[in-house]
Amino acid sequence: MYKLVLMRHGESQWNLENRFTGWTDVDLTETGREQARKAGELLKKEGYQFDLAYTSVLKRAIRTLWIALDAMDAMYTPVGISWRLNERHYGNLQGLNKAETAAKYGDEQVLIWRRAYAIAPEPLPLDDERHPRFDSRYAKIPADQLPATECLQDTVARVLPYWNDSIAPAIRAGRRVLVAAHGNSLRALIKHLDNISDDDIVGLNIPTGQPLVYELDEALRPIRHYYLGDAAEIEAAMAAVAAQGKAKKD
């Protein structure tokens, strides 16, 4: 049996402000840093050790991993960093407040933009300074692979090659792996692992800074999965994520 630990980054500044973040490189809040520290302490307390860790090229995920590994006294852990683990690209929605957008377009439309499997928001124009082709960290990525928007289906297509080529072989080789990434890149991976349908994936919400453990068989099929930590706290955090795209009530 293998174990894989997945963790969404701690609360970011735009999580706090309830904005569509996507590939925008915002940092953690103090709460987010504390979540990462507590996650690392919990992993250490539960006896977890890692041979390899993986994360995206976005600082909120990288810093979450750093802080968690530091709390485990394991900063020496080798880390693989890939743009393929980035958050889903939210196109022209990036930077907009989710509740204000819901008030303008309706809760249902925002839910479609946030959670529909095959519907992407309006793309960024090619000349928009927010387009990843203007960001030096993506300079070596072929231009036709850089998204101007994505749906979850696109995110799955981006994440799975990295899973198949890097993460899964490491697990099969007996490496103990931690992945610190983002809500939607982890949803994409979980959809693959658990074979979740396109319709059912809409209801999956991943809280910030909570270690999620997958026990896998020899074929990397899930035996079971569970969050570490307080169950009531995790349920409340999931509910908060689900409510982010709703208009505020007067």
From Swiss-Prot:
Pathway assigned to this chain's UniProt record: Carbohydrate degradation; glycolysis; pyruvate from D-glyceraldehyde 3-phosphate: step 3/5
PROSITE patterns linked to this entry: PG_MUTASE (PS00175)
Alphabetic keyword roster: Gluconeogenesis, Glycolysis, Isomerase
InterPro entries, per database record: His_Pase_superF_clade-1, His_PPase_superfam, PG/BPGM_mutase_AS, Phosphogly_mut1
UniProt-recorded Gene Ontology molecular function terms: phosphoglycerate mutase activity
Residue sites binding substrate per the record: 8-15, 21-22, 60, 87-90, 98, 114-115, 183-184
Top EC class for this record: isomerase
Residues flagged as site, Transition state stabilizer: H182
EC number: 5.4.2.11
PANTHER family tied to this protein: PHOSPHOGLYCERATE MUTASE
Protein name, per record: 2,3-bisphosphoglycerate-dependent phosphoglycerate mutase
Organism: Bordetella petrii (strain ATCC BAA-461 / DSM 12804 / CCUG 43448)
The encoding gene: gpmA
